[in-house]
């Protein structure tokens, strides 16, 4: 909404047009806004969660160091999502269909995660929302969204899969392949980030790095000058540039959330945060046609999810034998004797390296 205000004010005050005309300025402003909103609302939110006794449930078979986390305020993801939506309404171009799609993704997956957390933490339902019901809701939404995105993106012929580190190699996709790929990316990312969110600050830093990386790609691909110079397919779909603005909002809010989520965590994001942030990253990757770059930058999430699948498969197929001491894999390292902070920081380092590899693919082609 503010861009319309600044556009009107620019007729009377010279220089204010930068806030409405330059997307780079709005990227900076929305990241600052989302950061400040999260910082401002963080303490009241934590106090309210404590008052309502909405606290973390800790598994008895987990690392002993986790017992101190019991009853730590959870569902802090509401803080992140609210900040992102408010910031987008303030600084986003509200005529962009892509911005509204991302807001809808936040609301839908946020509702699923909120209901799951509410069942577990408030109503004390042991397993929360049943996995099959959660998967069904995610799947229906993802398939419908993938079909919508196919028709939106195909208007400008942007239906090719971009191959990293290649100047001209693109794989064309029809609607079936596109929908299937988008389905697995959105659902897989949502659940992978959810599995990664098991230690203080572990998930939010990789989320911020991946959001920043995808935001950079979105900015380049929707800028004809940069896209031509760097030999990218120019994505000229009206409003698609707002994806970069949205990514900046996620980065700002995520960094502010880390202020409260760093060890020892004062609040956890819960399923309402992790499921939603994962889904949003997947949708963004599909929108900007950088699914493989997303795989590279988000490989930590893939490994976390894969460790769970391997553990479950091994347990069922090998008569109860396990590959890891505990899954997801970050718990395996804890049970090997690594302090929680060392596990988290080393995973952050890995995530940063993956981000840099994905970033290098912009020029090394």
Swiss-Prot record:
It catalyses: UDP-N-acetyl-alpha-D-muramoyl-L-alanyl-gamma-D-glutamyl-meso-2,6-diaminopimeloyl-D-alanyl-D-alanine + di-trans,octa-cis-undecaprenyl phosphate = di-trans,octa-cis-undecaprenyl diphospho-N-acetyl-alpha-D-muramoyl-L-alanyl-D-glutamyl-meso-2,6-diaminopimeloyl-D-alanyl-D-alanine + UMP. Its EC number is 2.7.8.13. CDD domains: GT_MraY. Its cofactor is Mg(2+). GO terms for biological process: cell division; cell wall organization; peptidoglycan biosynthetic process; regulation of cell shape. One of its GO terms (cellular component) is plasma membrane. The keyword Disulfide bond does not apply. Pfam families: Glycos_transf_4, MraY_sig1. Its main location: membrane. It is a multi-pass membrane protein. Pathway: Cell wall biogenesis; peptidoglycan biosynthesis. The chain crosses the membrane at residues 22-42, 74-94, 95-115, 134-154, 168-188, 201-221, 240-260, 267-287, 292-312, 342-362. It is found in: Cell inner membrane. This is Phospho-N-acetylmuramoyl-pentapeptide-transferase. It comes from Francisella tularensis subsp. holarctica (strain LVS). The lineage of its organism: Bacteria, Pseudomonadati, Pseudomonadota, Gammaproteobacteria, Thiotrichales.
């Amino acid at each position: 909404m503010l861009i319309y205000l600044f556009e009107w004010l620019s007729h009377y005050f010279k220089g204010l047009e930068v806030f409405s005309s330059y997307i780079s300025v709005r990227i900076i402003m929305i990241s600052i806004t989302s950061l400040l909103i999260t910082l401002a609302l963080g303490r009241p939110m934590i106090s309210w969660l404590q008052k309502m006794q909405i606290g973390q449930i800790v598994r008895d078979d987990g690392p002993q160091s986790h017992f101190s986390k019991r009853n730590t305020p959870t569902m802090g993801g509401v803080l992140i999502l609210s900040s992102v939506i408010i910031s987008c309404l303030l600084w986003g171009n509200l005529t962009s269909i892509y911005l509204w799609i991302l807001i809808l993704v936040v609301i839908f997956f946020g509702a699923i995660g909120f209901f799951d957390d509410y069942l577990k933490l408030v109503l004390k339902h042991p397993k929360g929302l049943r996995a099959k019901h959660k998967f069904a809701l995610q799947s229906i939404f993802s398939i419908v969204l993938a079909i919508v995105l196919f028709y939106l993106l195909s208007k400008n012929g942007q239906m090719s899969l971009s191959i990293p580190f290649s100047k001209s190699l693109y794989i064309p996709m029809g609607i079936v392949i596109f929908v299937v790929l988008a389905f697995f990316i959105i659902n897989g990312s949502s659940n992978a980030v959810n599995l990664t969110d098991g230690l203080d600050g572990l998930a939010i830093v990789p989320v911020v790095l991946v959001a920043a990386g995808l935001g950079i790609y979105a900015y380049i691909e929707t800028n004809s000058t940069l896209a031509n110079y760097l030999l990218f397919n120019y994505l000229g779909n009206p409003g698609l540039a707002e994806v970069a603005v949205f990514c900046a909002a996620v980065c700002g809010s995520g960094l502010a959330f880390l202020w409260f989520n760093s060890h020892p965590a004062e609040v956890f994001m819960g399923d309402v945060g992790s499921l939603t942030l994962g889904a949003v990253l997947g949708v963004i990757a599909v929108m900007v046609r950088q699914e493989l770059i997303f795989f590279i930058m988000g490989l930590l999430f893939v490994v976390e999810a894969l460790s769970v699948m391997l553990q479950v498969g091994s347990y069922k197929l090998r008569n109860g034998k396990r590959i890891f001491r505990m899954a997801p894999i970050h718990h395996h390292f804890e049970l090997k004797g690594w302090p929680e902070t060392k596990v988290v920081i080393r995973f952050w380092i890995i995530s940063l390296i993956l981000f840099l590899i994905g970033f290098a693919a912009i020029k090394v082609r």
